Curated annotation (Swiss-Prot):
GO terms for biological process: diaminopimelate biosynthetic process; lysine biosynthetic process via diaminopimelate. This is 4-hydroxy-tetrahydrodipicolinate synthase. Catalyzes the condensation of (S)-aspartate-beta-semialdehyde [(S)-ASA] and pyruvate to 4-hydroxy-tetrahydrodipicolinate (HTPA). The gene is dapA. It catalyses: L-aspartate 4-semialdehyde + pyruvate = (2S,4S)-4-hydroxy-2,3,4,5-tetrahydrodipicolinate + H2O + H(+).
Amino acid sequence: MSLSGIITALVTPFDRDGAFDRDAWIRLLDLQLAGGVQGVVIAGSTGEAATLTDAEYDEMLCSAVVRVGGRVPVLAGTGLSGTAKTISQTKRAADNGAGYALVVTPPYIRPNQGGLKAHYLAVADQGGLPVVLYNVPSRTGCDLLPETVADLAGHPNIVGIKEACASRERVQALLALRRPGFTVFSGDDSSAARSMLDGADGLVSVASNVLPSAYRHLCDLARAGERGAIDLWNARLSDFHAFCGLDSNPIPIKALLQRIGIGYGLRLPLLPLSVCHHDIADHLADQVAALEALSSRKIVAA
């Protein structure tokens, strides 16, 4: 199953006691499928993967694979600081039914480009899943450069990249270097429309947790080259883009989800959204239902 369009980087919903909330998880998956998303990421950084137990990881992934039922691709976050552990986690994801591994650059270690290349080649050779590279230097402390991506893209088991740098020049460099069959995804909601107009294949989104249809429509417009319409639609989503950047991900998006009845809170060391932002969270949550209804009508009409 190929990758393109809108993919949601899912949160992990917890209950009031901080335990994994399976019921809320299933409702979140159903919301995404009903909203027309074209893929889901399980246990990435938005999913607070670093706080999950192995048992929770297995339960989330297995239940998602069953619930999705082959309708859209399921990507599992498997990137860890060490190569051997990343390979092991990728094998674990494969055993649980994932279709792809989303592999972030090793956090905190800060390998050079040669080390990053060797790391990804080892995971691609030994992990048992097609690999989507994930570059987010603001969180990991290292930057996977386009020339290194170009070298890695020649491996048959390395099939794409989620690029979270908002730089237009970075995305254009990746597009210029990619081979056929290698997909380039924006990992930044606010600049994704521009990236897709330039030729990127889709968006791995945070805000689509609450607005799956709205971000599906965003991707559809951008990939169709509808520049006038995309500017207007992106402007409607701009407050959500800005809100999701008010604090560390996934603090803001989980505040919105809680307001629409999915999950409670985060796990330490993350704390809930500051009280000073509650009014804007309430205001945006009040807009979700109407915006999703409008988006659904536009998707059907298209």
